[in-house]
C-alpha cells in the first residue's frame, strides 16, 4: 500500500524578515508526522497594498495562516478576510505581547522589527529580502547578474521558500521556473556572477505536492496535465538537459528540508557563508 504524505498550505505573513514565524510554524508542524506543510512566506508586509495580493494567494490555496503584524489595522484585515474564507488565522505574537503588557503594566511600542539590532547585517538581510521578493518566479530578468544565487526548477520544487530562507541570511536570491519547451531568459544565460543551481525532486513527490497545490484553486491550472506523472517526467528530463548543457549543478530536494537545501546550495560556493 502506498504511503502518501498529506500536504497542507501554511501561509506565513510578517512585517519583518519572517524568521520568527518560520521557526514557530516548523516547530508546530513537526508535531504532525502525517502532514507536511507547503510553506508560503510573505516577509516585509507593511501596508494594505502589499497585503492584498497575499490575501488573494491565501484564497487561491487555503490552509493555515500565521502572522506577526504589529499594525492593528493590517492584523484586523487578515483576521476578517480569513474568517470570510473559512481559514484559520493566528497572530503569533499577540498573546505573548498581551501577557507582557499585563505583567509589566505598560503598553507595547508596536514597532516593526523591534527584535532586530539595526546593524549592517540586519540591513544586508533586508536588502537581500527585497531583492529576492522582486525577483521571485522569473520577475525582473535583466537583474540576474546582481544576484548571489539564481535557483531554477520546474513547478513545486521549493524554489521560493528556499530563496526566502537564503535571503534571510543576506544572500540575494532570484528564482526562475523551468517550463517545458520554453527557453530560459537571456538575462540568466549571460549572467556571470551568480551561482545558478537547479532544484529537482522525484516524479511522485512533485505530483503529490501539485495535487495539494490545486486543492481549492478555482482557475489557472490544467489539472490533469499539471499532476500527470508522465508529463512531470518530461519536465524533469527537460530540466536535466538544460543543466547538462550549461553545466549547472542539480540538487534533489525530495528528502531535504528547506534548511538542508539551502545548506547544500551554500556548500557549492563557500564564500556565501
Curated annotation (Swiss-Prot):
Catalytic activity: N(tele)-phospho-L-histidyl/L-threonyl-[pyruvate, phosphate dikinase] + ADP = N(tele)-phospho-L-histidyl/O-phospho-L-threonyl-[pyruvate, phosphate dikinase] + AMP + H(+); N(tele)-phospho-L-histidyl/O-phospho-L-threonyl-[pyruvate, phosphate dikinase] + phosphate + H(+) = N(tele)-phospho-L-histidyl/L-threonyl-[pyruvate, phosphate dikinase] + diphosphate
Binding residue positions for ADP: 153-160
Keywords: Kinase, Nucleotide-binding, Serine/threonine-protein kinase, Transferase
EC identifiers of the protein: 2.7.11.32, 2.7.4.27
Domain of life: Bacteria
GO molecular function annotations of the record: ADP binding; ATP binding; phosphotransferase activity, phosphate group as acceptor; protein serine/threonine kinase activity
Family: Belongs to the pyruvate, phosphate/water dikinase regulatory protein family. PDRP subfamily.
Annotated function: Bifunctional serine/threonine kinase and phosphorylase involved in the regulation of the pyruvate, phosphate dikinase (PPDK) by catalyzing its phosphorylation/dephosphorylation.
HAMAP family per record: PDRP
Protein name as it appears in the record: Putative pyruvate, phosphate dikinase regulatory protein
Organism: Rhizobium etli (strain CIAT 652)
Amino acid at each position: 500500500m502506498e504511503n502518501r504524505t498529506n500536504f497542507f498550505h501554511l501561509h506565513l505573513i510578517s512585517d519583518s524578515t519572517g524568521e520568527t514565524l518560520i521557526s514557530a510554524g516548523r516547530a508546530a508542524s513537526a508535531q504532525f508526522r502525517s502532514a507536511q506543510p507547503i510553506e508560503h512566506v510573505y516577509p516585509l508586509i507593511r501596508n494594505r497594498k502589499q497585503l492584498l495580493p497575499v490575501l488573494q494567494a491565501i484564497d487561491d490555496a487555503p490552509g493555515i495562516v500565521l502572522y506577526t503584524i504589529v499594525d492593528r489595522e493590517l492584523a484586523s484585515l487578515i483576521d476578517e478576510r480569513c474568517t470570510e474564507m473559512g481559514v484559520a488565522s493566528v497572530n503569533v505574537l499577540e498573546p505573548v505581547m498581551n501577557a507582557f503588557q499585563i505583567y509589566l503594566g505598560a503598553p507595547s511600542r508596536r514597532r516593526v522589527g523591534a527584535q532586530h539590532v539595526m546593524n549592517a547585517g540586519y540591513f544586508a538581510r533586508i536588502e537581500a529580502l527585497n531583492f529576492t521578493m522582486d525577483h521571485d518566479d522569473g520577475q525582473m530578468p535583466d537583474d540576474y547578474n546582481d544576484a548571489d544565487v539564481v535557483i531554477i526548477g520546474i513547478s513545486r520544487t521549493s524554489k521560493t521558500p528556499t530563496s526566502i530562507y537564503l535571503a534571510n541570511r543576506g544572500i540575494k536570491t532570484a528564482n526562475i521556473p523551468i517550463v517545458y519547451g520554453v527557453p530560459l531568459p537571456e538575462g540568466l544565460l549571460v549572467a556571470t556572477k551568480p551561482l545558478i543551481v537547479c532544484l529537482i525532486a522525484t516524479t511522485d513527490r512533485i505530483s503529490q505536492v501539485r495535487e495539494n497545490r490545486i486543492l481549492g484553486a478555482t482557475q489557472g491550472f490544467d489539472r490533469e496535465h499539471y499532476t500527470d506523472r508522465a508529463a512531470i517526467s518530461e519536465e524533469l528530463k527537460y530540466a536535466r538537459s538544460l543543466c547538462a548543457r550549461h553545466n549547472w549543478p542539480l540538487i534533489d530536494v525530495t528528502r531535504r528540508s528547506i534548511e538542508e537545501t539551502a545548506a547544500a546550495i551554500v556548500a557549492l560556493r563557500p564564500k556565501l557563508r
